[in-house]
């Protein structure tokens, strides 16, 4: 697993050395909500001008997730698709949560709001997938 992440990171950093967008993940609201969900999801991401996206955050199951994908932007809107780690099954109060695989597909819709002191709030919607609920997420980003 570490080798796969290292390979993805090397490929990502090796192919893009120009302007990028850096972002900070803050947290989200899950719906439907459940008591086991962690809504504080600090993390960071980088997205190249070509759309390659790589990030990490503290996830719903209180694990570190690393993701890689591609973001297609059209105006203030974005659509990201890729793969993510950190959602292997976890038993909480006798109930199993998670997807059962090391790598899970991920998709997110986003809306970048106007900049405020050099940072743009980013609203994201991650649709439900299998047993995982939908998430409305907040991040802030800055383009270089």
Model regions: which residues?
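Residue-level signature of outer-membrane beta-barrel architecture
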Residues: 46-48, 72-74, 111-115, 142
């Amino acid at each position: 697993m570490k080798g796969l992440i290292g390979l993805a990171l090397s490929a990502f950093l090796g192919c893009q050395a120009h302007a990028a967008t850096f972002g900070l993940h803050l947290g989200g609201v899950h719906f439907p909500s459940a008591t086991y969900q962690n809504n504080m999801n600090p993390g960071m991401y980088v997205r190249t001008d070509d759309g390659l996206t790589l990030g990490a955050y503290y996830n719903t199951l209180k694990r570190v997730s690393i993701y890689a994908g591609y973001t297609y932007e059209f105006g203030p809107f974005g659509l990201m698709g890729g793969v993510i780690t950190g959602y292997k099954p976890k038993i909480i109060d006798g109930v199993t949560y998670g997807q059962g695989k090391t790598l899970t597909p991920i998709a997110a819709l986003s809306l970048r709001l106007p900049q405020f002191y050099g940072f743009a709030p980013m609203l994201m919607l991650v649709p439900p997938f299998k047993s995982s609920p939908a998430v409305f997420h907040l991040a802030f980003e800055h383009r270089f």
